[in-house]
Amino acid sequence: MAAKIRRQDEVIVLAGKDQGKRGKVSQVLTTGKLIVEGINLVKKHQKPNPQLGVAGGIVEQEAPIQASNVAIFNSATGKADRVGFRFEDGKKVRFFKSNSELVK
């Protein structure tokens, strides 16, 4: 089955502490989760590792967010949207359900 949300898609958060925020998908995990730039930031306590040249301290990084808590953002309508699939010229393409435009 093809993925409705893919890397580099702009998404909007529907539920959780970051509700209403938008960001680009940087990674899609096989567990049904996504990593979105600037969303679901957590503080991680990093131990120093002199062999790798990593300094210790508290690092802020993106944690995975459940795919059901985000929706793809339609820039034409300015709202969250649903995605459908159809065949055009023998290729399977994604389109927005609200206005039938292709997802870029």
UniProtKB/Swiss-Prot annotation:
GO terms for biological process, alphabetical: translation
Keyword terms: Ribonucleoprotein, Ribosomal protein, RNA-binding, rRNA-binding
Single Gene Ontology MF annotation: structural constituent of ribosome
Bilayer-crossing regions: none
Any single Gene Ontology cellular-component annotation: ribosome
UniProt key word rRNA-binding: yes
Role of this protein: One of two assembly initiator proteins, it binds directly to the 5'-end of the 23S rRNA, where it nucleates assembly of the 50S subunit.
Matches recorded under PANTHER family: MITOCHONDRIAL RIBOSOMAL PROTEIN L24 (PTHR12903)
UniProt record similarity statement: Belongs to the universal ribosomal protein uL24 family.
Subunit description: Part of the 50S ribosomal subunit.
Protein name: Large ribosomal subunit protein uL24
Organism: Shewanella piezotolerans (strain WP3 / JCM 13877)
